[in-house]
Amino acid sequence: MEIFDLTIHELHEKLKAKEVSSVEATRAMLDRIEAVDSQVNAYITVTPEQALVQAEDADRRIAAGEIAPLTGIPVGLKDIFVTKGIRTTCGSRILENFVPPYDGTAVAKLKEQGAVIVGKLNQDEFAMGSSNESSYFGPCKNPWDLSCTPGGSSGGSAAAIAARTATATLGTDTGGSIRQPASHCGCVGLKPTYGRVSRYGVIAYASSLDQVGPLTRDVTDSALLLGAVAGYDPMDSTSVNTPVPDYVASLAKGVKGIKIGLPKQYFIEGLDPDVKRAMDEAIAMYKSLGADIREVSLPNTEYAVATYYIIATAEASANLARYDGVRFGHRAEDARGLAQMYSKSRAEGFGPEVKRRIMLGTYALSSGYYDAYYVKAQKVRTLIQQDFLNAFKEVDVLLTPIAPTPAFKIAEKLEDPLQMYLSDIFTIPVNLAGTCGISVPAGFSAAGLPIGLQLVGKPFGEQEILTAAYSFERETQWHLKKAPL
C-alpha cells in the first residue's frame, strides 16, 4: 500500500512510530498529484513550497513528541476557504487572482494541529452547482469514470479522495455539496449541523445554509477531521457554543436497538434501480445488526427544492453584491464611469449559472414579489424543520438515498438547469432543517459507479450518525474499493 492510499489514522500511526516522515508523505502526495491530476482536474492551485515547509514543521513537532491526530497529514481544501498567502478563487474568474490576507477559522484549526495543506480544490463557481461543471477552471472529472461528473459543488474535494491525491479534504455543503459528490466518488462526506463549524473565512453563497464539513476515506477519519474543525468561534455569529464531543470514542457503540426511520417521501418512483437495490441491502444490513427499522413521514419534502432555490438564490444575490471591481477581484479595464465598471466587471467575472442564480434571487427579493416568494419560502422552511423534529420524536436516525441516480455524464444536464437542481432532492431538506447528514459508500451501479447512503441525525446528533455509519462500514467494506487511476 502506497503512502497516498493511507487514511488519516493509518498515516498518523506511521508518523508516530517514525516509520515515515511528514516530508516523505507530503512528497508522495505531491508526486501523486503531478501523476494523475491532469486527468482529474481536482486541484485549482497546488502549493508544493508551502506544503513542504509545513511538513518540515510537522516533523519537528513529531520529534518533540507533540503529535495531534492531523499533525503531518496532507490535506486539500475546497477553494472556497480563504487561505493566507494562497490564491483563493471560489472557482470564479472574478476571484481568479485574489490572495487573501488571512486564514479562515477551519483552516487555522487545521494549521494549529500541524496539518499540511497541499492545495486548493476545484468546485462549482461560488459553490453553485451539482456537477463541478460551472467552475471557471474547467470541469473536475470523476476518478471512477472520467467521462462522468464527480458531483458538486465540492467536486474536487471528493475527486481528490477517490484519486488519492489528498489524505482528507474539507468542503462546504449548502444543499448537498459535500454528501452528493462523496456519494458519486465513493468516499465519506459529512455535513455537520448548522453552527457546528465556523463559517468565518468561507466565501459566502447562502449564509443560512452553508456549512463546513470533512470528506474522507472512512468514517473514523470523518470523526477525526470533524473533531479538529468543530467548535464555537466568536468570529462567526451563527456558530453555536456547545462542547465538541470525542466523536471517535463513540464510534464502536453499535446500532443494536437504535430506531432508524425510512422517510416514505424519499423512496419514490423514478429512483434508479441500482440506487434502490443499494438502499434495500443497507436496510437489510441494519436489521441484521439489531436496528429497529420503521417508516416515517416528512410531508413537506415535495416543496424543498423550490423553497431552497428561493432562499439560497436570494441570499446569494445579497452576498455576491460585494463583487463590483472596486476593492478586490476582477475589474473591467475599459469601463467609462463607475456604473459601467460595476456592470462590466460583474458581466465578465461571473459565469452563466452564477448570473442565473443572482437574477432568480434578486427577482424573489424585489418589491411586489418579496412576500409571494421569499417570505413564503421562509414559512415553508419552518414547516420542513418541524417535519424533521417530529420524525426525531419517533426515531434516532433517518436513512435515505443521497441522489436519485449514480454520477451522470459530463454535459448531460447542462442544457436543463431544472434537471440539475433536482439531483439534490434528497439532500436539500437536511440543509433547510439545519441538521446533520453523512454519506457513506453503499455499493456500486452496474456500470461500476459508487452509490452512497445518507444517514440524517438530530441537530448536533453527529455522534449518532457517525456511529451508525461506522457500523455499516465495518460490515460492508465498500470504502476499501479504489478508483482505477
Curated annotation (Swiss-Prot):
GO terms for biological process: translation. Belongs to the amidase family. GatA subfamily. This is Glutamyl-tRNA(Gln) amidotransferase subunit A. One of its GO terms (molecular function) is glutaminyl-tRNA synthase (glutamine-hydrolyzing) activity. Its EC number is 6.3.5.7. The active site is at residues 78, 153, 177. SUPFAM superfamilies: Amidase signature (AS) enzymes (SSF75304). The gene is gatA. Heterotrimer of A, B and C subunits. It catalyses: L-glutamyl-tRNA(Gln) + L-glutamine + ATP + H2O = L-glutaminyl-tRNA(Gln) + L-glutamate + ADP + phosphate + H(+). InterPro entries: Amidase, Amidase_CS, Amidase_dom, AS_sf, GatA. Allows the formation of correctly charged Gln-tRNA(Gln) through the transamidation of misacylated Glu-tRNA(Gln) in organisms which lack glutaminyl-tRNA synthetase. The reaction takes place in the presence of glutamine and ATP through an activated gamma-phospho-Glu-tRNA(Gln). It is an enzyme of class 6 (ligase). It comes from Citrifermentans bemidjiense (strain ATCC BAA-1014 / DSM 16622 / JCM 12645 / Bem). GO terms for cellular component: glutamyl-tRNA(Gln) amidotransferase complex. Keywords: ATP-binding, Ligase, Nucleotide-binding, Protein biosynthesis. The keyword Ribonucleoprotein does not apply.
